[in-house]
Each structure stands twice: as structure tokens, then as C-alpha cells.
Amino acid sequence: MNIVIVQLGSLALITLAGPIIIVLLFLKQGNL
């Protein structure tokens, strides 16, 4: 059960952090 919870948690983090990371990278490229 713990493995399933960890997998779901990691998927949720990737789903939420994905767009944020893309935006941060875009802003960094824009600043450069």
C-alpha cells in the first residue's frame, strides 16, 4: 500500500511541478 501511495504522490508532484518548472525555465531564458 505504501508503494502505491508513494507512486500516486510522485505523479501528483510531477503533475503540479511540471508547469511550474517550465515557467521558471521560460523566465530564466527570457532574462538571459
Swiss-Prot record:
Record's keyword terms, sorted: Chloroplast, Membrane, Photosynthesis, Photosystem II, Plastid, Thylakoid, Transmembrane, Transmembrane helix
Signal peptide (UniProt feature, chain positions): none
Subunit: PSII is composed of 1 copy each of membrane proteins PsbA, PsbB, PsbC, PsbD, PsbE, PsbF, PsbH, PsbI, PsbJ, PsbK, PsbL, PsbM, PsbT, PsbY, PsbZ, Psb30/Ycf12, peripheral proteins of the oxygen-evolving complex and a large number of cofactors. It forms dimeric complexes.
KW Repeat (keyword) present: no
A GO biological process held by the record: photosynthesis
Membrane topology recorded in Swiss-Prot or TrEMBL: Single-pass membrane protein
Compartments it resides in: Plastid, Chloroplast thylakoid membrane
Keyword Coiled coil belongs to the record: no
Gene Ontology CC annotation, any one: chloroplast thylakoid membrane
Protein family according to the UniProt entry: Belongs to the Psb30/Ycf12 family.
Purpose of the protein: A core subunit of photosystem II (PSII), probably helps stabilize the reaction center.
Protein name as it appears in the record: Photosystem II reaction center protein Psb30
Transmembrane regions: 3-23
Pfam families in UniProt: PSII_Ycf12 (PF05969)
